[in-house]
């Protein structure tokens, strides 16, 4: 299953997301927000997305194969296409920890 990351899970579109190497740490936050909105926009148009962090594991190979300039840093990939509702992997759900297990909220119990 993990190898399918490198084939973009057979999606019709595979995106390689890069950042200019000279950008500061804040650019990662900006990119994360942009990718979030990209995923929301795709969903609004009936498309599904899947972020692929594994692509960065072989950034040198990807960079060479796609002739991406060296001043760009490969951050991740993104598969874009139509969700396959029948695929077993799309039915799998992990257990989720309750929010209280990893987050603390203070001051939200007062009325607005």
Residue ranges of model-derived segments:
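Acidic, surface-exposed loops and disordered segments
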Residues: 1-112
């Amino acid at each position: 299953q993990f190898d399918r990351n490198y084939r973009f899970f057979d999606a019709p579109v595979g995106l390689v997301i890069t950042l200019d190497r000279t950008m500061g740490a804040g650019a990662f936050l900006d990119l994360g927000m942009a990718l979030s909105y990209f995923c929301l926009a795709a969903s609004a148009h009936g498309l599904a997305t899947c972020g692929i962090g594994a692509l960065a594991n072989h950034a040198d190979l990807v960079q060479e194969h796609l002739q991406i300039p060296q001043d760009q840093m490969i951050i991740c990939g993104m598969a874009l296409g139509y969700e396959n509702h029948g695929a077993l992997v799309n039915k799998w759900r992990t257990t989720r920890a309750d929010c209280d297990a990893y987050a603390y909220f203070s001051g939200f119990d007062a009325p607005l």
